[in-house]
Every structure is written in C-alpha cells, then in structure tokens.
UniProtKB/Swiss-Prot annotation:
Residue positions where Phosphoserine is found in the record: 3, 35, 49, 102, 124, 131, 138
Record keywords, A-Z: Acetylation, Heme, Iron, Metal-binding, Oxygen transport, Phosphoprotein, Transport
Organism per entry: Sciurus carolinensis (Eastern gray squirrel)
A GO molecular-function annotation: haptoglobin binding
Domain Globin as annotated: residue spans: 1-141
Subunit-level organization: Heterotetramer of two alpha chains and two beta chains.
Tissue spec. comment: Red blood cells.
Modification N6-acetyllysine occurs at: 16
Heme keyword on record: yes
Protein name: Hemoglobin subunit alpha
Protein's UniProt keywords contain Acetylation: yes
C-alpha cells in the first residue's frame, strides 16, 4: 500500500520525466534486453538495437502507461485493466518480466536523476512498480 508520501514521490518523479518518456522507457527496455536476454523473445519482430525507433516507441508506451498509473494511484486496477488483459491473455508475458523491467526502470531513473533519487524516492518508486506489476499479473490467475 502506497502511503501519502509515496504517492507524492511517485507523482513528482513521473512529472520530472517531462518530454522524454520514450527516451527513458526505451533506455529501460534496452537495459532489460542487455541484462536479461531471454526477455527478447516477446519482441522478435522489433529492431532491438540500442536507440532504435522500436525501442523508443515501445518505451514511450511503457512510460505513458506508468504515467497514467501514477495519475490513478488510488485505482491502479481500473487504470491498468486493459493492459492487464493484454499481457495476460493475448501476449502471455511471463510475470517475472515485470520485475525485471521494474528494476531496469529504477536503474534508468537513478542514472538520469541522481539528485532526486533519494532513498525515500527509491523506496516509493519500488513500491509503485511492485504494485503495478501485481495488477498486471492479477489476471493470470
């Protein structure tokens, strides 16, 4: 459960992404594919070279979905219902991949916003991403 302080930290962090959601999301995906090559199996039709338009486009979708979730912290299941259905029933993404991407997102944010990435912000973002992952995997059962 996200506390009031967690919610403030999450919203502030996503607002700081500004006009760069595709860049941050794409970089996080790139980190995931390099660190965990088995995650590439879901993207066989993509150009997975660093900085490719496919990575940026999908990275923007990921970042936009997280921004939407950050705007609906009191109703994550409602905000992410369509994505949960998509990932569980159509794409059949292995649930562990959400944790891997969450880790890569945290690393990317820490690398680009070191002054803002305090231990409290890190903890809040980790809780947020864990909550998002839980919602996205809820329809697997």
């Amino acid at each position: 459960v996200l506390s009031a302080a967690d919610k403030t930290n999450v919203k502030a962090s996503w607002e700081k992404l500004g006009g760069h959601p595709g860049a941050f999301g794409g970089e996080a995906l790139d980190r995931m594919f390099l660190s965990f090559p088995t995650t590439k199996t879901y993207f066989h039709h993509f150009d997975l070279s660093p900085g490719s338009s496919n990575l940026k486009t999908h990275g923007k979708k990921v970042a936009d979905a997280l921004a939407n979730a950050a705007g609906h912290l009191d109703d994550l299941p409602g905000a992410l219902s369509t994505l949960s259905d998509l990932h569980a029933h159509k794409l059949r993404v292995d649930p562990v991949n959400f944790k891997l991407l969450s880790h890569c997102l945290l690393v990317t944010l820490a690398a680009h916003m070191p002054a803002d990435f305090t231990p409290a912000v890190h903890a809040s973002l980790d809780k947020f991403l864990a909550s998002v992952s839980t919602v996205l995997t809820s329809k697997y059962r």
